Amino acid sequence: MDLDQSDFEKIIEFLSLENFFVDKNFNPKSIGDGQSNPTFLIRDTENNFKVLRTQPIGDLARGAHRVDREYFVLKALSSKSFEAPEPFALCDNSELIGRMFYVMNFEEGDINFDPLLPNENLENKKKIYKSLAEVLGKLHSYDINELNLPFKKNHGFMKRNLSLWYDQIFHDESKKDKEIEKIYKNILTELPSDGGLSLLHGDFKLDNTVISDDKKCKAVLDWELSSFGEPLVDISFQIINWLIPSGVLYGIGGDWKENGLPSASDFLLWYEKSYKEEVDIQSLRNACIFSLIKLFCILKGIENRFHQGNAVSKDAEEKILAAPAIKEVLMNSFETNPNDIIVS
């Protein structure tokens, strides 16, 4: 996706009023898959690369593509020296170019899309996963009252979020899956209605992080889904990777040892040390079921849009094909003893 030249000129003018000066001779380069919030590489007059992130063009669903939300989160995290890009300027007046946008620092490093890290040696694989766990624990350890974010501090995020996803996909009786429905109704009664709140990333995974040359997590990207909620949301989304077979989405499965990766138990221990709290295994088991149902609903949503002929990501077919495997993992995990959920 290209950035319209007239829009770019308006952006340059706006940023100059914010004391941010763009190199007009460097054409914006589209980066990322462009399916969510269009993202461009730009350069300032001191020859430093920066990132411009905008809302998509056209009508947007209420509450979707909140780049202003991302900006405020990055601003709060920058004050904590957290591993995330520093934001510089936000334009929340959509009348300027028809949509909101902001600029943040460009973080150089590697983005890994294969969770098995085939190009890394054993030591580096451990460093990368340990760093991911520590950074996630650090995020969840922050006092949300000190972050000054305009987010609601309501308890019961997991119940609300799961109900939202489930109802969105299975509102039509003819499309309901009896096996999924049984698990959904059961787990909904097990999810917490209250408890501690943390700042959640909402989509914390390997390919949403930038890894430095010393194999540390240098920056966490894509904060569009961030909110206040139970930290179990983010940590369970990581732990299920050891339950999902390798080759299916972000799965590590039973190949973790063969590929020299740390275990889920290792990851959880590193996370707990950084978070400075122990995670209850029964609660984590329930959270893993939550994450698997939610992931299944996301995949079914992609399938629905695909069959309706609506625009979806380039890897839509791959994600659609993954749905049966995720359902199988979900059903097996639901019947598994909580202590066996944590692969070690």
Residue map of PLM features:
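Active-site activation/catalytic loop segments of kinase-like enzymes and analogous catalytic loops
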Residues: 233-276, 290-308
